[in-house]
Amino acid sequence: MVMHDLQEISGYCRASGAHEAGAQDEFWNRVRANIGSFDLREDERLCAIALVKRMFPVVVREALGWEIDTTRWPSTVYIAAVRWIRDVLAKNPSSAERYAKSVHHSVGSSAFTEQSTSFPDIDTGACAGFATLEPNYFHSSFILNSREVALADRQRRELIRELRSLHQAKLDSNTSVGPAPSYYALLLADGDSVGTLVRKYTGDVVAERLAVFASEVPGTVKRHDGVTIYSGGDDVLAMLPVETALKCAEELAEKYREAFSDIPNATLSVSLVFAQIRVPLTAVIEEAHRLLDKDAKESNGRNSLAVAVRNRGGFTCKWVTTWTRKLAGTDTESSSVDLVHGMAKKLSGSSLTSGASTSLVYRLRELISMLTGKSAWSPGDRITLLEELDGVRFIKAEVIRALADDQQDSVDSEELTDLVWNLLQAAPNRKLDSDEPRLARVTIDGLLLARFLATGGREEDR
């Protein structure tokens, strides 16, 4: 019933016997025939409030004369998969068409419900409407769920077989289609100390520059295959695919600085949550706000990026950093986003196999915990490391060990060690807790984030 303490509206009571139960089913089947099975599942019987909320976008024009663009917002599942969809359409259209036809044969036209206009470059009519498929049909876990998809066992097996055939199809000579990504990114941005700027430079001056920034946001997000949910003044809320989210965040910070080019110390902080598509959106939004306010701004001193990876079981990493950081032992500044993407490329299989890259990251986590005497690690931990321990030497030993296990001769161990060490450094905009010069702070979360990015946000789709 969705709202457990309110009565569903058919007027029939299933507990009164088979006749009442049958009449109730018939009532809801007639409702479902008019609105579609994706707006009302087979097992749903709604109360009046829930039905109004569910149907409001559909009937609001007729009832109130309002215009609501219900096609504007793609689902989080579609956002996660949009670049994958584009790749399949461009590089293996025959496989895309075959799968779309298989879904239509098994499920019918009710499976083709995606109407978002956010990606006009994607031809929704191509390949039997592949891009208009309800994007859950790109995931076997959805098809296997009998509550979500009412199919006979034989039809379910056939559809799973067709989906796996799509996964095994080729994008090019070296790359298979693979499963659709199961993660998307929620981005939240906010200007730092705007009130202070207003008091110093007046509201009109600041408002003029905020308007310049806000005008740049939709185009910036769109270039990264994202969707802007809200942009006003210094606030931004957007959804993006995993591959492009970090670079979009970095570009937004640059656009903010450009808009305030004549005002020093005007900076932007951003939080990003890479969320598994089944995690409730409300929980993702709450975490994005907490990351932005508590981690990027309060703990790290603003002008910062805070990133978390959230699967169905909880958080697997929380990485907080300044936008740029000094490379160890030099005065050279490097983009923190470029560093983590560079590490992800090393771990993606182009340099190391999946097993070796995973082994390296988790060995380093265990090594650092052992060196610091920390028995348990939690996402976001910044660990105190004595400089006398010569962390670089220990890390290089683990890198060489991982390369040897992988029988990998083409990777420069010195380069990989430098990349790892630079990514391990905590990068705050304010002093850490201790002023003791013999102490350094490291965090393993940057490496864990790189390992996640190397997967492209994909999970093994069984």
Task: Enumerate the language-model features and the residues they cover.
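Regulatory and interdomain segments flanking nucleotide-handling catalytic cores
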Residues: 1-462
